[in-house]
C-alpha cells in the first residue's frame, strides 16, 4: 500500500511475488551494531528464485526512517546480502559516502544475472570495503565509476574477480596506495581489453598483486610512474595476459 502499513518479517519465511508485485523492507530499529564476521550463520542474506529487481535505497535495511539522508554504515553491514542470488537482475541504490570495513564484502558475489553495477560514490574507503563485491558476476558488462582517492588495505581485492563479460576497467585515481589494495581486482576478466591508467607514485606491499591475472584480451598496459617500489608491489600483475 505504498509503505503505509508495515508488518514484522520472520526470518526464513518465503514471500511469493507475482510478475509486477513489489515488497519493501526496512529496519525495525536503527542498527548500529556490527556483524560477527567469524560466524557466517549470523549474516542476513536473500535467497531468491525467478527474476528479481532490487530498487531504491539499501540503507532502509539499516535505518527505520532516515535512510534517505543517513550517510554511513557499520562494519560488515551488507556482507553477503545478495551472494549467489542468480535471479537478481538489478541492484539497489548504494548511496553511502562513508564506508566501514567489509561493508560490501561479497555483497553481489555470484549474481550471474546482474548486468549493471550500482553507483559507488564514496571517495574515502575502508579495509576490505569492496572486496569480492562483484566476484563471479559473469554478466556484468560495465564496472561502476570508482572515484575514491583515499583507499585502504584490500579495499578492491577480488572486486571483479571472474567477471568474464567485463570489457573495460574504471579509472583508479588514487596516487597513494595501500597494502593489497588492487589484489586480484580483475583476475579472470578475460574479455577486458582496456586497462585503467594507474597514476600512483606511492606504492605499498602487494598493491598490484595479480591485478590483471588471466586478462588474455588485454593488449596494452599504461606506464607505471612510481620510482620507489614496495615489496612485491607488481608481483604477477600481468600474469597470463597472453595478448599483452
Range-by-range predicted roles:
Residues 1-244:
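Negatively charged
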